[in-house]
Amino acid sequence: MKNWLFVAVVFAMPGLAIAQGAKSCLTPPEAEALVTYALPSVIRAMTTRCTPVLPATTALIQSGPVIAARYQVDADKAWPAARVAFDKISGLDFATTVGEPAAKGLIEVLVGAGLSEKVKPTDCPKFDRIVDILQPLPTKNMAMLITTLMAIDTADRQKKPPFKMCSTPVSGE
């Protein structure tokens, strides 16, 4: 079974994998900042994408806007680190080039559009279940979980992640 959380977040950064330089990698805190910044856009995009196919009583439809608003608080705080991470993998000083508000908006649009392209309506019930299970988690824990799942999902495969994460030493060694 596909890791639907991975699909939902890997979502969203279709152009990042293409633009990323082979030697650029993100540390876990950088990856977590980027994911934290993307979470509200992911939830909003999934809510929009899945509203036509899910019952109104589902967690995503009922709670999606509230979850996105809750995640937005932390996303705003994560922006400076997310910007650095985005610049690192894109090889651009994006916010300086296009301006801070435009950079934020463009990244949010890329995330939402990328997700909408990748998620099929038949995936919506799976994403709804994930949201229902994980919605109590704080944003930081969600970002840590997502980046850890991304590392696991791409570690031994030929999959191309939306961004490369630097390998980290095993704790306790």
Please give the residue ranges for each predicted region.
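Sequence contexts marking disulfide-bonded cysteines in secreted/extracellular proteins
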Residues: 24-26, 49-51, 121-127, 165-167
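Glycine-rich, aromatic-bearing surface loops/beta-hairpins
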Residues: 135-173
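Early exported N-terminus immediately downstream of N-terminal targeting peptides
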Residues: 32-82
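Boundary at the C-terminal end of the N-terminal hydrophobic targeting segment
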Residues: 17-21
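Surface-exposed, polar helix/loop patches in the mature regions of secreted/periplasmic/lumenal proteins
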Residues: 79-150
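Sec-dependent signal peptide recognition
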Residues: 2-10
